[in-house]
Amino acid sequence: MPNAFLMDNTLIIGKLYQQFSNDILNVDVSSDMLSVTIAHPVIHEVIRFLKENPELDFGFLTTLCGIHYPDRGLPLGVVYHLHNLRENVRVRIKTFVPLTDPSLPTITDLFSAANWMERETYDFYGIIFQGHPDLTRILNVEYLDFFPLRKEYPLEDPTREDKDDRYFGR
């Protein structure tokens, strides 16, 4: 029996533009997955909208992770993957924060699964999730004074000739 309601990327982006037109910075589709870059001040409202809008119903947080692309001129970022289980549709939401103020609101009030994901993102990238119930390091030692997945440090000893950061995505 065919589904009477088939969600597609056009519907999702249309709903987002209706609510957040001034805050959408980029839209891209890769392998049929919609990717939307949002201004960081409204990220919590966008995630809430995607979850609570009855037509969209993105009620499952698949993952949340940090990113850092300094060679592309992009500061620190967070990528959220949301899933509508009823329609089996996924959406990727990205937002970027400046290195001078790497903070975003927590979404643990929307998805309890975000708790450890936000802690891991803080632990490795230093992104502070305001309002998080326990934003402490989760994998690294507490006294570590840097964030190991930021691309601010060379991967290898610069005097070694057998290693080249270009081969490791830098």
Residues of each region from the PLM?
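Terminal low-complexity/charged segments
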Residues: 1-170
